[in-house]
């Protein structure tokens, strides 16, 4: 049998999950002096490790644990196993250890694998993609989030007679992991994770630690993942632990059975502050002063940034620099690729005006912006930055504009979705090109591979007009308008781009389009029907142009783009009997539900 090549891995910090059970009988019987001494030494131990008195890098935290399996958990991340060994034995030397027993433990090491990037086989430092390299470093040198709750569980991949993970081809395993990651990315703004490998270290193959303010977000995430094939077919789980993070100073409250009420402050990817416990990574302490929103808006306007164009933004940053604009731009390009991995990122750009250069970064919330501030403050020649919350903005769940939502409602009333659930709408970036389609497809392939790393990307492909014209289009589908607009910066560099759909000055409503996947047996019939509908459209008042575009790689994947003088003219058609008949016909011939598209 052929020997399968395992995907490359890169390791970072070692992790010890140290679970402790309290001997409550001994604690109740102990004199006050002994209990005070135990709490004093225990608090000193925990605080010293949170403050990294034993190492230059890493992180530590403590959590109360619910249920019978443990009373509290001490979590250590350190550069070496020696550090963990010392931390574990150091606890046993405290007076507090006399009242506890190590009920369980888990040893692992943070890792990223070749499922994220094939070039990882050659090592993380050899990756040419700086954005991906920085993202992976954040995974293996993580900050502990300041979230209220934690969940830990170990897991392995199944090696049974019917389902053996390690017998699958690499491409199949990578596809499983990609789809699995798609589920997790839907919770990226609610749940943080640390993934660590433990083959040869402990009884399972991985240790998973999840952090969230709302514990039901953890439950919802894991529940949804159970239906993903990578879990339902191939995952085996160990015991689960759930608990609440607390400060070392609250140890006495834990032993007194009092509520743990203080706010944690360990810092994370979305936290407001970054404590000293997050060593070993670029500083993410805020490098900006907060100013009035109107003052910041005025400053951004001076550099040509209109905040009204970014309704999703909840916090804005501006860092002026004395360095050359090109040098700053080169640095920001790398940061932007890193920032784009987070759903809370809206936009980061470099602007130059009147001999002044500024890096401007917009985020959905202040916590994420504060972390970004630490990176932006390290830009060449950067002065101390300024930031401000943007009133009425920053809803991380917002997709599209109020006008888009109004259109969605009208389309739903007209049954345009042919039964499609609300909320599956997408944004399409459509660029027309005069280049050879084969050349376009080759150029787009490299970009599409880059886009695939982002959870908001749906697909990108080259389409030819089959009915209604002779243009070639590059189509890129995204969940969010801002993401599509960002993609436009890259796609506009494709060869011989001549126009962007929706930019026709005569068109007052260029947001309407439909994507269809047609059953192969009905393809020819569908095209003929489109011809008939096209004839009806040509006679309609307010209609400018409609084309049927076909994916060059899949002739059954089609895109209908319509341009109208105004929204009212378009909606008149969608309320017409002719369109209703078309929808009924579509229920029979479509392999998938049509998706309404807003042109970005």
Curated annotation (Swiss-Prot):
Region: Disordered, residue numbers: 261-289
Top-level taxonomic group: Archaea
Residues covered by the ABM domain: 510-598
Matching Gene3D superfamilies: 3.30.70.100, Apc35880, domain 1
PROSITE patterns xrefs: ABM
Alphabetized Pfam families for the sequence: ABM (PF03992), Chlor_dismutase (PF06778)
Biased composition (Polar residues): 270-285
Binding sites annotated in the UniProt record for heme: 180
GO molecular function, one term: oxidoreductase activity
Keyword Transmembrane helix part of the UniProt annotation: no
Record keyword Iron present: yes
Keywords noted in UniProt: Heme, Iron, Metal-binding
Assigned protein family: In the N-terminal section; belongs to the ChdC family.
Protein's recorded name: Putative heme-binding protein NP_2262A
Organism for this UniProt entry: Natronomonas pharaonis (strain ATCC 35678 / DSM 2160 / CIP 103997 / JCM 8858 / NBRC 14720 / NCIMB 2260 / Gabara) (Halobacterium pharaonis)
């Amino acid at each position: 049998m052929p020997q399968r090549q395992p995907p490359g891995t890169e390791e970072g910090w070692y992790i010890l999950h140290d679970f402790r059970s309290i001997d409550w009988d001994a604690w109740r019987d102990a004199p006050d002096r002994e209990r005070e001494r135990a709490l004093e030494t225990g608090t000193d131990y925990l605080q010293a490790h949170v403050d990294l008195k034993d190492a230059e890098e890493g992180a530590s935290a403590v959590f109360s644990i619910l249920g019978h399996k443990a009373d509290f958990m001490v979590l250590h991340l350190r550069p070496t196993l020696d550090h963990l060994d010392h931390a574990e034995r150091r606890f046993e030397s405290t007076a507090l250890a006399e009242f506890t027993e190590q009920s369980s433990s888990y040893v692992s090491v943070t890792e990223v694998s070749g499922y994220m990037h094939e070039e990882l086989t050659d090592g993380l430092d050899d990756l040419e993609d700086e954005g991906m390299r920085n993202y992976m470093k954040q995974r293996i040198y993580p900050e502990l989030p300041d979230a209220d709750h934690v969940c830990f569980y170990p897991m392995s991949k199944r090696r049974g007679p019917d389902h053996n993970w390690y017998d699958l081809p690499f491409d199949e395993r990578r596809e499983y992991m990609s789809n699995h990651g798609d589920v997790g990315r839907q919770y990226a703004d609610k749940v943080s994770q640390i993934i660590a490998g433990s083959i040869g270290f402990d009884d399972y193959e991985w240790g998973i630690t999840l952090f969230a303010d709302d514990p039901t977000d953890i439950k919802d995430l894991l529940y949804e993942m159970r239906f993903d094939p990578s879990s339902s077919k191939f995952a085996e789980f160990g015991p689960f632990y759930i608990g609440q993070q607390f400060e070392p100073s609250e140890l006495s409250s834990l032993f007194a059975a009092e509520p743990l009420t203080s706010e944690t402050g360990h810092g994370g990817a979305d936290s407001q502050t970054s404590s000293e416990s997050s060593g070993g990574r670029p500083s993410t302490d805020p490098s900006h002063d907060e100013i009035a929103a109107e003052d910041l808006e005025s400053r951004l306007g001076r550099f040509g940034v209109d905040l009204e164009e970014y309704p999703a933004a909840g916090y804005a940053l501006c860092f002026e620099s004395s360095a050359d604009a090109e040098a700053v731009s080169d640095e920001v390009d790398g940061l932007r690729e890193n920032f784009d991995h987070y759903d809370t990122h809206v936009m980061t750009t470099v602007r130059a005006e009147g001999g002044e250069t500024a890096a401007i970064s917009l985020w959905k919330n202040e916590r994420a912006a504060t972390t970004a501030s630490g990176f932006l403050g390290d830009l060449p020649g950067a002065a101390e930055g300024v930031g401000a919350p943007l009133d009425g903005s920053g809803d991380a769940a917002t997709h599209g504009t109020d006008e888009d939502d109004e259109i969605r409602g009208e389309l739903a009333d007209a049954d345009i979705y042919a039964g499609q659930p609300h909320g599956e709408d997408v944004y399409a970036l459509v660029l027309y090109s005069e280049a050879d389609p084969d050349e376009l497809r080759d150029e787009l392939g490299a970009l599409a591979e880059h886009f695939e790393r982002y959870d908001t990307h749906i697909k990108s492909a080259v389409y030819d007009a089959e009915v209604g014209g002779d243009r070639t289009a590059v189509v890129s589908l995204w969940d969010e308008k801002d993401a599509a607009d960002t993609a436009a910066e890259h796609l506009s560099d494709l060869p011989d781009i001549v126009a962007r759909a929706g930019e026709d000055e005569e068109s007052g409503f260029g947001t309407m389009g439909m994507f269809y996947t047609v059953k192969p047996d009905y393809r020819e019939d569908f095209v003929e029907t489109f011809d008939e509908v096209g004839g009806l459209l040509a006679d309609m008042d307010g209609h400018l142009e409609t084309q049927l575009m076909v994916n060059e790689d899949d002739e059954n994947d089609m895109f209908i783009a319509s341009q109208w003088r105004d929204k009212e003219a378009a909606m008149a058609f969608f309320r017409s009997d002719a369109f209703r008949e078309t929808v009924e016909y579509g229920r029979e011939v479509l392999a998938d539900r049509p998706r309404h598209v807003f042109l970005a």
